[in-house]
């Protein structure tokens, strides 16, 4: 199996609404492995760094304020196709355009409060993981259920 890692964050609105276990459960049920998790309140400069690619957008200032408004659950998930599938699991950026069954489609209502972030590609995933976690915070292990998820048994 060709494993990769992705950065997933539950935004302050998702944390405040008590959606942590629901979101974690969806990634676990799919068969992905959680390799790092922590709860942080990002500083404004840290949030600016996370969204540096969007600094010219009109919504940038509000986005940074939102991200630094409360606790964020930062996670790294591992598995085959986890970046692409993680995005599918999350749903469209705008919850109104998200399919039912996706995290945003089921749990979020408006674009400005869409509860979750996921890396959009391999390079972004590497950069975001490096920004949010020290290498020693990432745990390497083989999940007991792996042979039942991927085969080869």
Curated annotation (Swiss-Prot):
Keyword rRNA-binding attributed: no
Protein's UniProt keywords contain Thylakoid: yes
GO molecular function, one term: metal ion binding
Disulfide bond entries: none
Gene3D superfamilies associated with the record: Nucleoside diphosphate kinase-like domain (3.30.70.141)
Gene Ontology BP annotations: CTP biosynthetic process; GTP biosynthetic process; UTP biosynthetic process
List of residues binding ATP: 11, 59, 87, 93, 104, 114
Main localization (coarse): plastid
Recorded catalytic activity of this chain's protein: a 2'-deoxyribonucleoside 5'-diphosphate + ATP = a 2'-deoxyribonucleoside 5'-triphosphate + ADP; a ribonucleoside 5'-diphosphate + ATP = a ribonucleoside 5'-triphosphate + ADP
UniProt record similarity statement: Belongs to the NDK family.
Biological role: Major role in the synthesis of nucleoside triphosphates other than ATP. The ATP gamma phosphate is transferred to the NDP beta phosphate via a ping-pong mechanism, using a phosphorylated active-site intermediate. Shows the highest specificity towards GDP.
Name used for this protein in its record: Nucleoside diphosphate kinase 3
